Amino acid sequence: MSLITRVLQGNLTRKNALQTLTRCGYSSHAKFAEHRPIEKIRNIGISAHIDSGKTTLTERILFYTGRIAEMHEVRGKDNVGATMDSMELERQRGITIQSAATYTMWKDTNVNIIDTPGHVDFTVEVERALRVLDGAVLVLCAVGGVQSQTLTVNRQMKRYNVPCLAFINKLDRLGSNPYRVLSQMRSKMNHNAAFIQLPIGVESNCKGLVDLVREQAIYFEGENGMDVRLDEIPQDMRVESQERRQELIEHLSNADETFGEFFLEEKPFSEADLRAALRRTCINRTFTPVLVGTALKNKGVQPLLDAVIDYLPNPGEVENLGFIEREGKDPEKIVLNPARDGKDPFVGLAFKLEAGRFGQLTYLRCYQGVLRKGDNIFNARTNKKVRIARLVRLHSSQMEDVNEVYAGDIFALFGVDCASGDTFTTNPKNNLAMESIFVPEPVVSMAIKPNNTKDRDNFSKAIARFTKEDPTFHFFFDNDVKETLVSGMGELHLEIYAQRMEREYGCPVTLGKPKVAFRETLVGPCEFDYLHKKQSGGSGQYARIIGVMEPLPPNQNTLLEFVDETVGTNVPKQFVPGVEKGYREMAERGMLSGHRLSGIKFRLQDGGHHIVDSSELAFMLAAHGAIKEVFQNGSWQILEPIMMVEVTAPEEFQGAVMGHLSKRHGIITGTEGTEGWFTVYAEVPLNDMFGYAGELRSSTQGKGEFTMEYSRYSPCLPDVQDQIVRQYQETQGASQPDKKKKKN
């Protein structure tokens, strides 16, 4: 029976109950909501590949810091589930679907935590969490090592310049090898990384850790590993500890000039010097400290919390920029003031929207100033005013009211009409905005319809809510086939939303077969000179545009660009937006397969206008005509999404697995083997990956598993393109276009 359960059932006296809860570290919400100086604030995320133990680690952190009074498991037998997995679907499936925020305290430092999903289909949750965090804990499985989503998270951290600690988890699992994981971090992720802890035994012999910084052994004893005992390093580990400590010193010396002087001049240095070098290099992203443990067995969590405080930055050590728009000039960069004194105007960034019990909940990070209940703020994008009626801080699905928030705090507001990535400020006149959030393009589409026509209202409400909350979930109606389609990052992504429609809105839906989001692009430049002229009595329509459409480089083949290169007044500037609008409208549907255009630059170079008959509408229609001209005269090809696939299975099935990947047009990029298992890495077209899960199970006797994530768009094979074009033409009731219109 847990301590808190005994308290609730009255098995302890009031005095003993207080002592018991205090020993647990359990504290009231007020303790965590106290205002603290900026040096005592940490904003961290916990990110990793799926099933690496992120949520279990967060549960232990909350317990050891006194935020919760008892621990629950991700797949707990008590039907409670982990604190941060508040959605029923998360608890059923044992996976994290939405990022969840909480805040706690460790050694007088306020730690704001965002636990993120590990599945590639929910990668936007990681993206927007990392955008507003100052540091992160990258969790790696001691068995699985660096996996596909680990690489994705690593790229996201690099994009937002987020310093991180690495925590090699699951030391207790059969086959765990933290030394192999460190080697993968260096080779696959290009991290300058070294252990600052070593395991005392692995698998069933996992007893504790060796701290290489303080040169002591750490053991976790008592109920739930709450008693941390320091001791001498075991005799049989002293040689290895010295070697690994020397390796740590060498890696730090290469990354930090100040510490390098100690090493080169062979000067003695203190533990404080070593810690200072670790902090400097970690914040500068030139070194990654590697810690070890097993969250499930309650080992290594408290030293990880110490490392978060010691080595990850506070909000004042991270430079955050705002941009002030100047008409006709490049935006002016402004460094935001992170001081928690409220002297500067409030600046905050909305990074997540969620429909709560009391209306829309908007998650924000405060970057400058202070925000109090009753204040007015403005959305920098829409210039709409919002009055703050209620301020809350989040503990998973629980909301805790606060009166004010300061720079560095993560909080939420109710009833704010905005989008992810919007900037809010108290001064609407300075046109200040922060850099928004990168949103990947959806790669899979499915037809969707409610099972019962009476549920259409609820279906519409669900779609409206989910598309607003999740920028990677798209909805549209295809007029050609008269189908409603949803697009997302993968089959699981769309299946989860279908299940949520039934659970949360009482609207069961049927999903069709998945469809790949192909794209169409130009093979080479194609010039155009189009005149749109219409006269039917009264004022007519007149617009002429001259220019060229050309392909963008392969690394930009998901973008569409419009460039106004006109000189003089042949195309008046007030009509140029009409040309761009017409271009982007026509880019929604290509000629070969009906898919969107991408990887194209539209260069408007010249044209002509009529003083009476020209208008923005006329130039928009001229753009329509010009693109139809390019459809006919240009050489086109179809692009398809390529996935990075990682398959792990017993060695005896390696030939079968690689054979199946080759049949699916996969290109093998690497293989690894260890202790009877192998891992193969391949790039495979998404169109060829449907049904692979069943094939892998049958060919490996159910022992194989795979993950995949989006890599890039690449031209289709000629026979694949012919098949796609033929299928599209059949649905249009037309014959296949002239072969000259497309190039493979």
Swiss-Prot record:
State the superkingdom. Answer: Eukaryota
Cellular localization per UniProt: Mitochondrion
Give the CC-aspect GO terms. Answer: mitochondrion
Pfam families linked to this entry: EFG_C, EFG_III, EFG_IV, GTP_EFTU, GTP_EFTU_D2
Tell me which residues bind GTP. Answer: 48-55, 115-119, 169-172
Q: Where is the composition biased (Polar residues)?
A: 725-735
Output the NCBIfam families linked to this UniProt entry. EF-G, PRK12740.1-5, small_GTP
Q: What does this protein do?
A: Mitochondrial GTPase that catalyzes the GTP-dependent ribosomal translocation step during translation elongation. During this step, the ribosome changes from the pre-translocational (PRE) to the post-translocational (POST) state as the newly formed A-site-bound peptidyl-tRNA and P-site-bound deacylated tRNA move to the P and E sites, respectively. Catalyzes the coordinated movement of the two tRNA molecules, the mRNA and conformational changes in the ribosome.
The molecule here is called Elongation factor G, mitochondrial
